[in-house]
From Swiss-Prot:
<feature type="domain" description="ACB">
    <location>
        <begin position="6"/>
        <end position="94"/>
    </location>
</feature>
<dbReference type="Pfam" id="PF12796">
    <property type="entry name" value="Ank_2"/>
</dbReference>
<dbReference type="GO" id="GO:0000062">
    <property type="term" value="F:fatty-acyl-CoA binding"/>
</dbReference>
<keyword id="KW-0963">Cytoplasm</keyword>
<feature type="binding site">
    <location>
        <position position="81"/>
    </location>
    <ligand>
        <name>an acyl-CoA</name>
    </ligand>
</feature>
<dbReference type="InterPro" id="IPR036770">
    <property type="entry name" value="Ankyrin_rpt-contain_sf"/>
</dbReference>
<dbReference type="InterPro" id="IPR014352">
    <property type="entry name" value="FERM/acyl-CoA-bd_prot_sf"/>
</dbReference>
<dbReference type="InterPro" id="IPR002110">
    <property type="entry name" value="Ankyrin_rpt"/>
</dbReference>
<feature type="binding site">
    <location>
        <begin position="36"/>
        <end position="40"/>
    </location>
    <ligand>
        <name>an acyl-CoA</name>
    </ligand>
</feature>
<keyword id="KW-0677">Repeat</keyword>
<comment type="function">
    <text>Binds long-chain acyl-coenzyme A molecules with a strong preference for unsaturated C18:1-CoA. Does not bind fatty acids. Plays a role in protein N-myristoylation.</text>
</comment>
<dbReference type="InterPro" id="IPR035984">
    <property type="entry name" value="Acyl-CoA-binding_sf"/>
</dbReference>
<keyword id="KW-0446">Lipid-binding</keyword>
<dbReference type="GO" id="GO:0005737">
    <property type="term" value="C:cytoplasm"/>
</dbReference>
<dbReference type="Pfam" id="PF00887">
    <property type="entry name" value="ACBP"/>
</dbReference>
<protein>
    <recommendedName>
        <fullName>Acyl-CoA-binding domain-containing protein 6 homolog</fullName>
    </recommendedName>
</protein>
<dbReference type="InterPro" id="IPR000582">
    <property type="entry name" value="Acyl-CoA-binding_protein"/>
</dbReference>
Length: 288
């Protein structure tokens, strides 16, 4: 098949999976991830989002699968997607004529932003309806194997909403919005706040490590932030830095004489236990 025919068949395969998710309920998790990551690679290209935090297990799995395809050409990802659909449902395309694609399924930046905007508006509308009906509203069933295009966030939506409504605007807030000048001012006003924790046990340093803000992390450490502090899940700043693949921050933390790499979280895991195939080689080298 020509590239144009592959592109068209890919689009049909995506439609087939989306419209027949009920019939394909026995698909294994790894097969779902395979479809997901190849869809993302085929329509967007290389992973362009930051790794989700450790506590977003589903998001992290999806991110890892997509990121593992870095460098794979879009047309190759399309073929991979089609091949698995063929294996899962032989003959699905027996009555379909593969013709030249009339509309590209590739997404440019403008289209991607427009889809994100639309998804956000739909989410806000659904939330509004829920509030008006006291939460008694039927939510649409998810068909995640289809074209799910929302970007991942390092912090879950609920936490972000809390931050937006945070009238206190404490040190953790200013770190989360990457305002280093305000962080400096807050520390100058009261150094005692540097190790204060939020309701989930996160300090300002943990926030900086989660979001990859190196300069802020460095500033916090220089001003006495505890590099071995544990949040509500027992995770240390180093746990966060490894999970979120933040090489410079990992290096910064490991350069501290007081760092303890052997601290276990509540699941009995030390930071290096989170190193997997998706972890950058630079980070892997730090723990050899």
């Amino acid at each position: 098949m020509t590239d144009a025919q592959i592109e068209n068949k890919f689009k049909l395969a995506v439609d087939y999976i989306t419209n027949n998710s009920g019939k394909l309920s026995n698909i294994k998790n790894e097969e779902q991830l395979y479809l997901y990551c190849n869809y993302k690679q085929a329509t967007i290209g290389d992973c362009n989002t930051k790794a989700p935090p450790f506590y977003d297990y589903i998001g992290k799995s999806k991110w890892n699968s997509w990121n593992s395809l870095k460098g794979v050409e879009k047309i190759v990802a399309m073929n991979s997607y089609i091949s698995l659909v063929n294996a899962l449902s032989p003959g699905w395309d027996s009555n379909i004529k593969v013709e030249r694609a009339t509309q590209s399924v590739f997404l440019n930046d403008e289209e991607f932003k427009e889809l994100e905007k639309k998804e956000k508006e739909e989410k806000e509308e659904l939330k509004k309806l829920e509030e008006e009906n006291g939460g008694e509203i039927e939510k649409p069933k998810s068909k995640w194997m289809g074209p799910v295009l929302s970007k991942f966030s390092l912090v879950d939506d609920e936490t972000l909403e809390k931050l937006e409504k945070n009238t206190k605007q404490d040190l953790g807030y200013w770190v989360s919005v990457n305002d280093i000048e305000r962080v400096k001012k807050e520390i100058e006003n009261d150094k005692n706040i540097i190790n204060e924790v939020d309701e989930d046990g996160r300090t300002a340093l943990i926030w900086a490590c989660d979001r990859g803000y190196f300069e802020i992390a460095k500033l916090l450490i220089e001003n006495g932030s505890n590099v071995n502090v544990q949040d509500g899940e027992g995770m240390t700043p180093l746990h966060y830095a490894v999970v979120c693949d933040q090489f410079e921050i990992c290096k910064l933390l490991l350069s501290q004489s007081s760092i303890d790499k052997s601290i276990k979280d509540n699941s009995d895991s030390i930071p290096s236990d989170f190193i997997d195939s998706s972890t950058s080689e630079n980070i892997k080298s730090l723990f050899k």
